[in-house]
Each structure stands twice: as C-alpha cells, then as structure tokens.
Amino acid sequence: MKSFSSGSLQTDPSNRKLCSCSIFHAAAFLCMVFVVGTSFVAFDYKEKMSAEIPTDAVEITRGNLQTDLSKLQTPRANSWSHESTQSKSCESPCISSGSEPLPKGIVMRKSDLEMVPLWGPPKAKESVSSQKSLLAIPVGIKQKEIVNKIVTKFASHDFTVMLFHYDGVVDEWKDLQWSEGALHISAINQTKWWFAKRFLHPDIVAPYRYIFLWDEDLEVQNFHPERYLSIVEREGLEISQPALDPAKSQIHHQITARLRKGHVHRRMYKFNGGGKCSKKSSSPPCTGWVEMMAPVFSRAAWRCAWHMIQNDLIYAWGLDMNLGYCAQGDRTKKVGVVDSEYIVHTGLPTLGGSDEKMGSSDLHAANHRFAVRRRSYVELEIFRNRWQKAMAEDKCWTNSYPEH
C-alpha cells in the first residue's frame, strides 16, 4: 500500500481542482457570515439607540423631516404662485382688439392728423402739443372767401385744420397760404356728420384738446379762438358753442343768441307760448344744449358723441337734444354758450344747392333743398325711435336724466 505524500498531492490535477473549490466555498462562507453578522450588529445598535433616545427627540426629528420636505415643496408652490400672478398681470382690459398676438410695446392704439415728410431719415415722432386743437369744416368752393377768413383766424394759433370737400373741388384751394398745411378730404355730396363719423374717430383725434366741428357759413370777425378756449376751460365746459349775433344771424333756438352781460350762459328763459323755460328747467333746449352748426367738444365729450352719431343718419338731427349725456357731468353746468366770443350764422343753403356745372335751374335747386329738409325730418324721427328702443332694451344702462 502506497503512502500518501504531499508531493503527489501537488502534482495531481484533480487534487488541485478540489483545493481551488474548497478555497472558494470557504471564502463565500466567510462573506456570508460577515454580512449576516453586520446586520445583527446594526439591528442591535438601532435597538439600543431607540431605547436611549427620548420620545420628544424622535418627534423633533420627525418635525425637522416634515419641515425639510415643506422646504423642498416650497419652490414648486412659489412657481405656481408666480405663474398665477404673471397670468393675472397679463390680463389687461386695455389690449386693443386684434392686437393680442403682438407684444404690448409695438402696439400703437392712437394716432393723429399731423403730416410727416417723405424724405430724410425717420425720426422718433414727437407727440402732438398738449395745447393743440382741431378745426374741421365741410366746404364748397363757392364759400372759399368766408372759409378763408375762418381758417385764417385758427391757423395763426395752435390748430390743425381739416377740410371736408363735399363738391370734390380741391385744387382751387391751393393758392391760399394755409392750404398746404391743411388736410383735404373729398367726397361728393356728403355732410359734415358723414365725414366726422368716418374721419374723426376718437382714437385719431385723441391728442387734440378740443374739436371744433363747424359749418362753413359762419362769420368770425368777433371771434378769437385762443380767448374762447381760455373761457371754456375756466368755466369747465365740455360741450360749447360761440353765441350768435342776434342782429345778423338766423336764430333757430333762443338759447344760442348772444347775451350782452357776462361771458357765458347755460340756459334760456321763456315764459310765454309753448315750451316754457325757467330756472327750474333741466332739459334741452332750455339748458344743456348747443346747436349743431358750430359745436366745440372736449376730447372726452367727443369720444362719447362720436359713438352716438349714426352711420346712416347723415344730418344728425336729434343728436343735439342728447349731447348732454356726453357732457362728462351735469349738463346744466358742463354745456354752455360763450357770449364774449361770438359769430354770425349766415344760413347759406349749401347742401342741395344749385350746381352751375350741371346746369341745374333755380327750381331744381329749390327742389333739392326741399328734399334735404324732408330727409332731415325723417332722420329725426328715426333717431328718436332708435333712442327710445335703445333705452328700453339696455337693462344695464342707467338714465342720468330720467325726465328727458
């Protein structure tokens, strides 16, 4: 029987393999023992720590944990709050309809009637002078002389001038000194109110302090625009007109006639006949009323009045009785007639007059004027009906003058 020697063990491959496996299993066993032992030690340590740490300390730890969690959540809450605040700040009632896709800084809501040169580098446009006002007149070439006198009075002051050419003649005005600086708009046989509705939008004339919307048949020898406006501002008039010289003018309503005492009057007195007016009267035409041949509006009053002008009612009859609603306050105080600056209303029959180029006879001209007058009365009735209907249907509107 052979003895078992160490040499033979080292040289036998099978024994070498057995030795390697034994070493591997031994190492694995030791690792398992170490892991399990460590777990028991850690568990035992936690148990001991739990026994040694007071309950209130545990609660504090939990509280700190909750506080830390709330801190982690705060940025998200603040983010929501910021988004909500930003959303509210972006809700602006002043955004112009149609401009929503544009950044606010590029939107120009208003404009003006000032002309800009065609040449030279573009410059930042200066705003219209805060003292500037607007004179707008419907004109025909036959009244060129009287219109020239009116505009000359205004052009020497801080006014922009706009002419509405209802006869289509524009070139024959070019010889007048002020013509090149005026705005000329031409549309055949259209009225002052037709032009005003379409070319004097409140956002276009907003830069101007006052809007003078005058007829062409006015004489202005005793009228000075600058003095007139100083009186209007001092008296707080939002809607006004210069008084008419009773000796030379066509007077349709007594309230427009000039009084020799004082600078302004706001009511008339009539004690006989129909339509009596006293100091207790609060409705037009006794008070709060001007005639439509030479009204003057503040920009705020015009913004209101423009909306009342009807697109299809080109003579605006009936509008005068309701202008007090646009007076920005008590119409018995905010509407008035300026006596110290007065004019003459000649009453020329311009609309529907004869057209020499067409060879119209005087009879035809008279017929045209009669047709104009008839349509004016029809428009008056239509406007009254619309006003009554609008008052009845608008449940959100409050009538400032229920006696009206």
Language-model segment annotations:
Residues 153-163, 168-170, 178-184, 234-240, ...:
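Structural alpha-beta junctions
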Residues 137-139, 163-167, 339:
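Short beta-strand/turn micro-motifs composed of small residues
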Residues 164-210, 221-223, 271-272:
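Active-site-proximal specificity loops/subdomain of glycosyltransferases
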Residues 14-20, 219-336, 349-376, 380, ...:
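Conserved catalytic core of nucleotide-sugar-dependent glycosyltransferases
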Residues 2-118, 311-404:
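C-terminal catalytic/acceptor-binding lobe
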